[in-house]
Regions:
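GHKL-family ATPase ATP-binding module
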Residues: 5-9, 13-295
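Conserved P-loop NTPase motor core
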Residues: 1-3
Length: 295
């Protein structure tokens, strides 16, 4: 996702109307250049921002991936409580009313789940954290989506590491032995949604969040809230513990098998080396080796 300056630079025109402090403000650009200076207009009770723009056909082709655009608009309706989106791709108007983050999780969950989705939320120092998660029975990978101000942080960041740490800490608190982070992530489906005033990203592509303070906020929220859910929902906790213990056993069995394979390889290498010791004579009759195929 890019900002208004970037969109303006690649648009044939870009107009913005802002409703705030009881007035309407307008500004307009063409080909990235200012053509309508900022103007304070009429009084209004409205709030919000209206953006109109058209991508420059000298930069972009006329072909637009409408399916991708519709998917993004639906994603925005999930991430923003109270938001209504209307769009028309030429075949009639579509209204997307705000849906919950829980609905988003259900939309991306393709396997049978252990229980109902768990939802946690906290606000601290102008930062709001929303987390929704569930576990699937027959899923051995994981799906964790992370967002910051509607930007999909595909490479994760401090909010993701805080989420993982919180999950692990909560499950350790109920006494599961030999547990690792890989064990608790198996079968997990989750969404972490952050709203903050001044996000700090690694690089211009905004794919990785660098905010240690948010890591702690997410970790504390998930650890405390998930621990409470595990304490209150005994059946869910029992089923999840059973699933994780299966993952732990599979990991330990695989580790043991690898160790046994290494020992066998080492023993075989020792025997082969002993039989094929380095030559210490220059006499070919004493140093030659014949390899015969067959019996």
């Amino acid at each position: 996702m890019v900002g208004s300056s970037c969109v303006n630079a690649v648009s044939s025109f870009f107009n913005a109307t802002v409703y705030r402090d009881g007035y309407e403000y307008t500004i307009g650009f063409e080909k990235g250049l200012l053509v309508k200076p900022l103007k304070k207009g009429r009084k209004t009770k409205r709030t919000g921002t209206k953006i109109e723009y058209c991508l420059d056909n000298e930069i972009y082709s006329e072909k637009v991936d409408l399916n991708k655009l519709a998917k993004k608009l639906k994603e925005l309706s999930y991430l923003n409580d109270g938001l209504t989106i209307k769009y028309n791709f030429g075949d009639g108007w579509i209204n997307l009313k705000s849906s919950s983050l829980v609905d988003y999780l259900k939309d991306i969950t393709t396997k049978e789940t252990i229980g109902k989705p768990l939802y946690f939320k906290s606000t601290q120092d102008n930062t709001t954290v929303e987390v929704v998660l569930n576990y699937c029975n027959d899923l051995y990978s994981n799906t964790i989506l992370t967002f910051v101000n509607n930007i999909n942080t595909l490479n994760g960041g401090d909010h993701l590491s805080g989420f993982k740490a919180g999950i692990l800490q909560a499950l350790k608190s109920i006494g599961i032995k030999d547990i690792t982070q890989d064990d608790v992530l198996e079968g997990l489906v989750a969404i972490v949604n952050i709203k903050t005033l001044e996000p700090k990203f690694e690089g211009q592509n905004k794919l990785y969040l660098q905010m240690p303070e948010i890591r702690e906020q997410v970790k504390n929220l998930v650890s405390e809230s998930f621990s409470e859910e595990l304490s209150n929902k005994k059946t869910f906790a029992k089923q999840l513990t059973s699933k994780i213990n299966v993952s732990i056993k599979a990991r330990l069995d695989a580790k043991k098998a690898r160790e046994n394979a290494r020992k066998q390889k080492k023993a075989l290498k020792s025997v082969v080396v002993e039989k094929l010791a380095d030559c210490i004579s220059n006499d070919p009759n004493e140093c030659e080796i014949f390899i015969v195929e067959g019996k």
